[in-house]
């Protein structure tokens, strides 16, 4: 079994402006510096003495020597009567090395790749009429018998980007398991509500086009859906039976703009 030779010690004064260690000529594997416990108060001349032995290089030793060199430099800094923040910063600058902090920015268009919060729900108007898909792109409001409740459409309500306030929440209303979303477009001189087919690979997304966005407002136990593209125009139903839903302006008037919402799953 190999035996470890006894280290031979000698004393030398140590000083370095560059905080470098002293190494053997053949590389950093063998090292000359070994720090022994120091009593700085006992050194009259204020110098730093290191005891030298042949030992393997250790990263922790480099840190210890760096701190000792920093202490040596501190001895040469004139002491002020009051310790201030600037003094503390100068001490830290001797011991720690600053590293740049890099902030990454992202394009808003990339946010569509992130998950969009949504819930599934059913809507009934104030007269308890349910919404059903009467044709591929037409929603109608009518009273359903118990045996026909499965005809009622289920909405996927997505929470999207918009002008959110304390009482208004921007949402998009899509039909569950269908590539159809309610949207608002101008036809002639009047905003019109329609079901628009979309690409399921792209929708829903956080940054929806404004025609798909409705500001949901809760009033007591009911909700209203105002078009974000056409303010003061609301998703409405007629008091007559089995009529298509539409965009109306007579809030609280003849047309019905308030709905009850049954949440199926958050």
Curated annotation (Swiss-Prot):
What role is this protein assigned? Answer: Potent pro-inflammatory cytokine. Initially discovered as the major endogenous pyrogen, induces prostaglandin synthesis, neutrophil influx and activation, T-cell activation and cytokine production, B-cell activation and antibody production, and fibroblast proliferation and collagen production. Promotes Th17 differentiation of T-cells. Synergizes with IL12/interleukin-12 to induce IFNG synthesis from T-helper 1 (Th1) cells. Plays a role in angiogenesis by inducing VEGF production synergistically with TNF and IL6.
Q: How does it assemble?
A: Monomer. In its precursor form, weakly interacts with full-length MEFV; the mature cytokine does not interact at all. Interacts with integrins ITGAV:ITGBV and ITGA5:ITGB1; integrin-binding is required for IL1B signaling. Interacts with cargo receptor TMED10; the interaction is direct and is required for the secretion of IL1B mature form. Interacts with HSP90AB1; the interaction facilitates cargo translocation into the ERGIC. Interacts with HSP90B1; the interaction facilitates cargo translocation into the ERGIC.
- State the similarity comment: Belongs to the IL-1 family.
Q: Which cysteines are joined by disulfide bonds?
A: none
Q: Under which name does UniProt file this protein?
A: Interleukin-1 beta
Q: Which domain of life is it from?
A: Eukaryota
Q: Where in the cell is it found?
A: Cytoplasm, Cytosol; Secreted; Lysosome; Secreted, Extracellular exosome
Q: Where does the record place the site Important for interaction with integrin?
A: 168, 176, 178, 187, 201
Species assigned in the record: Delphinapterus leucas
Alphabetized, the UniProt keywords read:
Cytokine, Cytoplasm, Inflammatory response, Lysosome, Mitogen, Pyrogen, Secreted
InterPro entries in the cross-refs: IL-1_CS (IPR020877), IL-1_fam (IPR000975), IL-1_propep (IPR003502), IL1/FGF (IPR008996)
User: Would the keyword Cytoplasm be found if you checked this record's keyword annotation?
Assistant: yes
A Gene Ontology biological process noted in the UniProt record is: cellular response to xenobiotic stimulus
């Amino acid at each position: 079994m190999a035996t470890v030779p006894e280290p031979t010690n000698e004393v030398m004064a140590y000083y370095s402006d560059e905080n470098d260690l002293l190494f053997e000529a053949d590389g950093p594997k063998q090292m000359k510096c070994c720090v022994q416990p120091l009593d700085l108060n006992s050194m009259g001349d204020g110098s730093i003495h290191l005891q030298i032995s042949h030992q393997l290089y250790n990263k922790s030793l480099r840190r210890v020597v760096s701190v000792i060199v920093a202490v040596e430099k501190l001895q040469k800094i004139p002491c002020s009567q009051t310790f201030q923040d600037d003094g503390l910063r100068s001490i830290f600058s001797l011991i720690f090395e600053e590293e740049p902090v890099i902030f990454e920015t992202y394009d808003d268009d990339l946010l569509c790749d992130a998950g969009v919060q949504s819930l599934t729900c059913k809507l009934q108007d104030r007269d308890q009429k349910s919404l059903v898909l009467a044709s591929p792109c037409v929603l109608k409001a009518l009273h359903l018998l118990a045996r026909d409740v499965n005809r009622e459409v289920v909405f996927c309500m997505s929470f999207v980007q918009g002008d959110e306030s304390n009482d208004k929440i921007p949402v998009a209303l899509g039909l569950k398991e269908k590539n159809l979303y309610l949207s608002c477009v101008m036809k002639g001189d009047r905003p019109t509500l329609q079901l628009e087919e979309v690409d399921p690979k792209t929708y829903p997304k956080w940054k929806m086009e404004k025609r798909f966005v409705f500001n949901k407002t809760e009033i007591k136990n009911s909700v209203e859906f105002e078009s974000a593209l056409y303010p003061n125009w609301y998703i409405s139903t007629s008091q007559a039976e089995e009529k298509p839903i539409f965009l109306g302006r007579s809030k609280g008037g003849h047309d019905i703009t308030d709905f009850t919402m049954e949440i199926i799953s958050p």
